[in-house]
Swiss-Prot record:
It is found in: Host cytoplasm. GO terms for cellular component: host cell cytoplasm. Plays a role in the inhibition of host protein synthesis. Specifically, inhibits the initiation of cap-dependent and cap-independent translation. In turn, affects the outcome of infection by decreasing recruitment of inflammatory leukocytes and reducing the memory CD8+ T-cell response. GO terms for biological process: symbiont-mediated suppression of host adaptive immune response; symbiont-mediated suppression of host gene expression; symbiont-mediated suppression of host translation initiation. Induction: Expressed in the early phase of the viral replicative cycle. Belongs to the orthopoxvirus OPG173 protein family. Keywords: Early protein, Eukaryotic host gene expression shutoff by virus, Eukaryotic host translation shutoff by virus, Host cytoplasm, Host gene expression shutoff by virus, Host-virus interaction, Inhibition of eukaryotic host translation factors by virus, Inhibition of host adaptive immune response by virus, Viral immunoevasion. This is Protein OPG173. It comes from Monkeypox virus. The gene is OPG173.
Length: 74
């Protein structure tokens, strides 16, 4: 008996392969491989986020308590 194979390849999902004959049915699900372009885009976004964090760190103002005023509980 010939084996029948169906492959479903989605642009956004996993690759699903269904193989069957009269004796058994096999379903394989594999994660979609990222294209090199998508990986480079993700890396550039990560670099931009890192730059944003550095800018935010520069804008932090430290407030020091030097007024010598103590609060006493009575």
């Amino acid at each position: 008996m010939d084996k029948i194979k169906i492959t479903i390849d989605s642009k956004i999902g996993n690759v699903v392969t269904i193989s069957y004959n009269l004796e058994k049915i096999t379903i394989d699900v594999t994660p979609k491989k990222k294209k090199e372009k998508d990986v480079l885009l993700a890396q550039s976004v990560a670099v931009e986020e890192a730059k944003d964090v550095k800018v935010e760190e520069k804008n932090i103002i430290d407030i020091e308590d030097d007024d010598d005023m103590d609060i006493e509980n009575t």
